[in-house]
Structures are given as C-alpha cells and as structure tokens.
Amino acid sequence: MDFKRLTAFFAIALVIMIGWEKMFPTPKPVPAPQQTAQQQAVTASAEAALAPATPITVTTDTVQAVIDEKSGDLRRLTLLKYKATGDENKPFILFGDGKEYTYVAQSELLDAQGNNILKGIGFSAPKKQYSLEGDKVEVRLSAPETRGLKIDKVYTFTKGSYLVNVRFDIANGSGQTANLSADYRIVRDHSEPEGQGYFTHSYVGPVVYTPEGNFQKVSFSDLDDDAKSGKSEAEYIRKTPTGWLGMIEHHFMSTWILQPKGGQSVCAAGDCRIDIKRRNDKLYSTSVSVPLAAIQNGAKSEASINLYAGPQTTSVIANIADNLQLAKDYGKVHWFASPLFWLLNQLHNIIGNWGWAIIVLTIIVKAVLYPLTNASYRSMAKMRAAAPKLQAIKEKYGDDRMAQQQAMMQLYTDEKINPLGGCLPMLLQIPVFIGLYWALFASVELRQAPWLGWITDLSRADPYYILPIIMAATMFAQTYLNPPPTDPMQAKMMKIMPLVFSVMFFFFPAGLVLYWVINNLLTIAQQWHINRSIEKQRAQGEVVS
C-alpha cells in the first residue's frame, strides 16, 4: 500500500469525522398532530418575556447561582471549578440572564386550564445572600396567598454537587379541591458557546430521553425549519412516565430529571408531558409538565424535581438518572467512543494524569491492532524493497500502459507482493481514530487537565503549536519509510500532506494531537523494524513471505 493510499484513508477519516453530523443529521422526532386546549394555554404562558431580575445570590463550593426574587427563575449559574473558555481568569458561566446570552431555568404552577396561577404575583425571600453552611443550603421564596393557596418555591443546593432540587410547597385553604400541575422549563437562545470552531464544533441544543423514544436531539435548525414552514410555533410533544430533558453544549448540560437513579418518578400521578419548541420571541425551550395528585381543601402537598446543571462528567451523570450519560455528545460513534473513554478513565485512575493515560491508551490500541498493522506495514515494506524494479519497468515500457501493468503484476507475483495488502488494515483503523477523536474531544474530564510543561489543558489546542510541529516531523519521517512513488505528482503529495495535516491539527485538542504523535512514533519504530527485517532477509537470499 503506497503513501497516496495511506493519506487518502486518513483524509477520508477526517472528512467523515468532521462532516458526519452534516451528512447524516439526526432524524426529527415525530411531532404530535394537535395541541389540546391545556397545551395551548401553557404555550401562551411560556411566551411571557423574561423580566429584569431582582437577584438573590447563592454561593456553594461548586456554583454561584442568581435567582430572580420576583419570578423565582434561576437566571444565572456560574460553575466555580471551571474556567471560562475565552478567559482563564474568570469562572465558566453556564446560565446567562440575557446580558451576554439567554439561558435560564424556569418553573411554574398551572391550574387545570394551563394558566400560571403565580403570574403577576411574585415571590419574596427573607434575605438576598445565601452561602453554604454544612452540607446544604435552602432558599425559600414565598408568594402571597392566591386563589386560597399558600405557595413556596424552595431551591436546595448541595455541597460538592451540581444537582439543584426545585420544590413547590403548597397549602390548600381555598375551600375546594385544587388540581394543579408543575411546569419546568429550560429556555435559551441559539447562540453558540465560546470555543466553538470548524474543527472543534459540537452539538448545542435540546435533548430528550424517554424509554419510548430513546435519546434524541432536537436541533435549533430543525425547530427553525418547522417555524419557517408556516407553523406559528414548532413543537415536539409527547407523554412519558419517566426520562429526562434539557439542553446540552460542549462539556456541559442542564437537564430536568423525571426519575432519579433508583428513585421514584415525578410522574407518579400521571404521565408527564414533554414539550420542545421555538417560541415566538425566538427563544427555544424544553419543558415538562408534571401532573400533581388532587390537593383536598385543608391539605398540604409538594412538587419536587431535580435539575442537573453542570459538567458532563461520566462517573457523575451515570449515577443521576438512567442513560443520562447519553447526553455526553460522542456523535454517531457513541457505541465505540464510550468504551474507549472508559478504558482511558481506568488508566487515569491508575496513573493520575490524563496526558500519560492517553499515551498508555495509544500503546494499548497499537498493541491490539498489531496483527492488522503488521500485515499492512510488511506489504508496504515489500513494495519499498521492490521500488527499483518497479521504476525499471516504468522506464522500460514507457507509455505502453498495458505492457507496464502486465509486467508489474508479474513482479508482484514473483515477489509475493499484494499491492492491496495494506488497505484493509488501514481501513479498520479509521473507526478507532474517529472513536478516539470523540472520546477525547467530548470529555469534560480533559478540560483544564494538564499534561506537562506548556500543555495545561488537553481539551484545547497546543498554545505554541509544538505538538503539531512534532506531528508534522513524524509524518515526514514516515514518508521515507514508505515505498517511494514512481509518479512525480505523488512525490510532491508526500511532501505536502504532512504540512497540510499539521496545519489542520493546529486547531485540534492537544490530547488528540498527543495521541497522533505517539501513534506516529510507534508506527515509525514498527515500520523501521519491518523494513530492516525484510532487507536483511533479501540480503541473505531468503524468500520474503
């Protein structure tokens, strides 16, 4: 297999890796054909503009939250243990209140007709600043009595956690039975987070998981297309007894959890209704309406749900809800990238450094693929040894392509060379490369993870381009170990391709470039050893098999 085929395969791998989502977009879930009167009323309620916030600030060891005292919305959430993508001196802000972008969590109580019973009422809190004391901090917002109902909204933040419990405490003194439902929403605009680029682009938008429909992405563009097609609002509605829904972006997520791992579903009183749509104000929302059991006069009740708003740390989210780890966006190769990351994580637990874990993983992958790559490289080595004879055939027959081809095929037979012997092994390595790309690119565990020296964040590009330059050098070295091409154009390609690949890798995460560099070094060692072995066999007059 010559270098032209080799680079072609790697180019195919990169094209597939970068363009897969565009070539094979996620199918749209089937929308419900019609809304009920209650659904339309909920939609009208959701269209209310985001009012300016009266801030209540909550600070724990993991987050700083800003809650609007009037509406009770969670309008800003700063993740204190993560740095901003564009400025490492600032913490990462997940939720935004509309100054830079809009991304908030809202919750309401609805009557039987779908009307927000707290609309225009407003909450109040005993103080404006809360901080963690002990394992938990509770923020209680109280609303004036309305319709004979006394309602409190309670946020509970837990030490060391990104789970926020949102609870309504309801006391019915209305003189009649109250039939209510709780509506929970995550609302955001379509702006992309910092750090998104052509080579480092990940999905941003709504996601939903239900046992009936499994995991689905409902992209902003899908919702926009439906809105442009003539619908006043694009909606995806379904009923479910359990699941989760929310928004994801690169490394982070926010999801309402309908059933905690090993716990009871919040939909115990009846199926919950999930609704994903583009609103009239051009904001996008994922919401779930949870029916409550009837509250008799004089009785008390509560509606409680967990919101996970934080990093997509596999070991954490896998224990929060069933299949929540699917929100970690490995693209179309989740089935392959997920076990690769599992192995990488196990190595990290032993070694304690993600960079060295990547190096050890590269060695393991190389060892597993050795039988395949060895056959490929032996084929290339035999082609390299036969290169002078191939050049002589080309010079002898000149433009007589038919005679030239026949002579070359006879040479391949005499030398026991299979010109396509290296193709299949290289093709089988493409899924490995794509899987590793997504395993390294999508994993928040590598965010801000140092290796050594100048590499302080394996999830970002090498700031000094040292690794891409080393990678280019290793690719140039490989060209001298491969069969020299007889075509002058191919010879030029051999010199240009390492430069092209290194420029592309300037923008790739340092962790991925590190993998590629180590893989190249191992390949050089393997190819050099095979070349020397075959040359020695030929020098001794042995038949090379």
UniProtKB/Swiss-Prot annotation:
Matching Pfam families: 60KD_IMP (PF02096), YidC_periplas (PF14849)
GO MF term list: membrane insertase activity
This protein's record includes keyword Repeat: no
Localization terms from the record: Cell inner membrane
One cellular component (GO) term of this entry: plasma membrane
UniProt-listed InterPro entries: Membr_insert_YidC (IPR019998), Membr_insert_YidC_N (IPR028053), YidC/ALB3/OXA1/COX18 (IPR001708), YidC/Oxa/ALB_C (IPR028055), YidC_ALB_C (IPR047196), YidC_periplasmic_sf (IPR038221)
Cleavable signal peptide: none
Ranges annotated as spanning the membrane: 350-370, 424-444, 461-481, 498-518
Keyword line: Cell inner membrane, Cell membrane, Chaperone, Membrane, Protein transport, Transmembrane, Transmembrane helix, Transport
Topology with respect to the bilayer: Multi-pass membrane protein
One annotated GO biological process: protein insertion into membrane
Described purpose of this protein according to its UniProt entry: Required for the insertion and/or proper folding and/or complex formation of integral membrane proteins into the membrane. Involved in integration of membrane proteins that insert both dependently and independently of the Sec translocase complex, as well as at least some lipoproteins. Aids folding of multispanning membrane proteins.
Subunit structure and binding partners: Interacts with the Sec translocase complex via SecD. Specifically interacts with transmembrane segments of nascent integral membrane proteins during membrane integration.
HAMAP family: YidC_type1
Family recorded in the similarity comment: Belongs to the OXA1/ALB3/YidC family. Type 1 subfamily.
The protein's name in its UniProt record: Membrane protein insertase YidC
Originating species: Neisseria meningitidis serogroup A / serotype 4A (strain DSM 15465 / Z2491)
Organism placement in taxonomy: Bacteria, Pseudomonadati, Pseudomonadota, Betaproteobacteria, Neisseriales
Gene: yidC
